[in-house]
Amino acid sequence: MAKQTRKLTTNKTKKKIFRGVVHIQAGHHNTIVTITNIRGEVLCWSSAGACGFRGKRKSTSFAAKKAAETVARKSRDFTMKAAKILVTGPGQGRESAIREIFKAGIKVSVIREKTGIPHNGCRPPKKRSV
């Protein structure tokens, strides 16, 4: 008896948005770039690790640039013209990711710094006794 092959169909349609929000999370070890709509629903994302960088190369500004370039290419499917940029974290790839978003032709209205600053939050670890 011959097996029937089923055709995979996707009913998912690409949402058309005019304005979006670009979130850049630049940590010490990785940079994650996410594009959301104004309500915060994720449309596409990329990271330095997802672009193929491993180990200490993942934390470089070049890896962040490649992640932002990948997200900007994906954002063309949504016909996004303008965006706000929200930057979080102390990592190296912040400026290079922002620059890459500008190069992609997306009009940027606001660049906002969202890095959390502790008001003497967590207690530091106990001193080593040798």
UniProtKB/Swiss-Prot annotation:
This is Small ribosomal subunit protein uS11c. It comes from Chlamydomonas reinhardtii (Chlamydomonas smithii). Keywords: Chloroplast, Plastid, Ribonucleoprotein, Ribosomal protein, RNA-binding, rRNA-binding. This ORF was detected when the sequence of the chloroplast genome was revised. Its main location: plastid. HAMAP family: Ribosomal_uS11. Part of the 30S ribosomal subunit. Belongs to the universal ribosomal protein uS11 family. It is found in: Plastid, Chloroplast. GO terms for molecular function: rRNA binding; structural constituent of ribosome. GO terms for cellular component: chloroplast; ribonucleoprotein complex; ribosome. PANTHER family: 40S RIBOSOMAL PROTEIN S14/30S RIBOSOMAL PROTEIN S11. One of its GO terms (biological process) is translation. InterPro entries: Ribosomal_uS11 (IPR001971), Ribosomal_uS11_bac-type (IPR019981), Ribosomal_uS11_sf (IPR036967).
